[in-house]
Amino acid sequence: MTKDISKNESVVFDVQGLNLWYGEDQALKNIKMQIKKNKVTAIIGPSGCGKSTFIKTLNRMIENIPSVKTTGEIIYQGQNIFAKSVRVEELRTKVGMVFQKPNPFPKSIFANVVYGPRIHGIKDKKLLMDIAETSLRNAALWDEVKDRLHDNAYGLSGGQQQRLCIARCLAVQPDVILMDEPTSALDPIATYKIEELMESLKKHYTIAIVTHSMQQAARISDDTAFFLMGDLIEFDKTTEIFSNPKDKRTEDYITGRIG
């Protein structure tokens, strides 16, 4: 069961009848949901349910796999993202991605953050430094690295590397941040810092996060979507999903009876 929870709230993604196949295997089945502006939407479900596939479809990153084919629409900024007129590079700038494992480039901390702006033609050193500082501040990392910006990013801890990847994403001024299990490789303290950061970031960005942790979804998200075997079983406000699920399969999953 999916509920329309978008009344009086701005919709960033309107997903309409989305189907996706890997070759002959269907991974997403007639997905219909809306992701709201300046909210955190959690995508939950057991391994292989389609949640990572879904989130990677929102900026068409899934198309890097040759066998993928899709039907349906994802409306973003009034346009179907699958339309031929959509430039994928621009879409991925506006809809950034943070992955499960921190993936800094083998460059300095500074060079990591300004990599995107440089690709987009920004060369002015002062402007690049301003972008780096702003992005690192917004990723809650500036105070920890401001005196070693030209050190190799590999010298950072895992949690710091993940926040650096978030800063790198922010540097190109996205509207949306997609996160695919961003804390699964981190310790509890680093996880807490990322979760605290998400609460701050949603004031300016829309966030969708895939997580295996029910506790994390309950803590950080405003809305939650439960996927099972490629189907969207239930989508509602997080408080409703965890306190009053409408579908027994949702209840069974969040209470540990399936998954």
Swiss-Prot record:
**SMART domains reported in the protein's UniProt record:** AAA (SM00382)
Which GO terms of type biological process are on file?
phosphate ion transmembrane transport
Which CDD domains does the UniProt entry name for this protein? ABC_PstB_phosphate_transporter
Q: Which GO terms describe its cellular component?
A: plasma membrane
What reaction(s) does this enzyme catalyze?
phosphate(out) + ATP + H2O = ADP + 2 phosphate(in) + H(+)
Keyword Iron found: no
Which residue range or ranges hold the ABC transporter domain?
Answer: 6-254
List the subcellular locations.
Answer: Cell membrane
Task: Please give the InterPro entries that the UniProt record associates with this protein.
Answer: AAA+_ATPase (IPR003593), ABC_transporter-like_ATP-bd (IPR003439), ABC_transporter-like_CS (IPR017871), P-loop_NTPase (IPR027417), PstB-like (IPR005670)
List all membrane-crossing ranges: none
The EC number of this protein is 7.3.2.1
**Which Pfam families has this protein been placed in?**
ABC_tran (PF00005)
Cite the binding residues for ATP: G45, P46, S47, G48, C49, G50, K51, S52
GO MF, one annotated term: ATPase-coupled phosphate ion transmembrane transporter activity
Keyword list, A-Z: ATP-binding, Cell membrane, Membrane, Nucleotide-binding, Phosphate transport, Translocase, Transport
The record's similarity note reads: Belongs to the ABC transporter superfamily. Phosphate importer (TC 3.A.1.7) family.
**What is the recorded name of this protein?**
Phosphate import ATP-binding protein PstB
Name the encoding gene, please: pstB
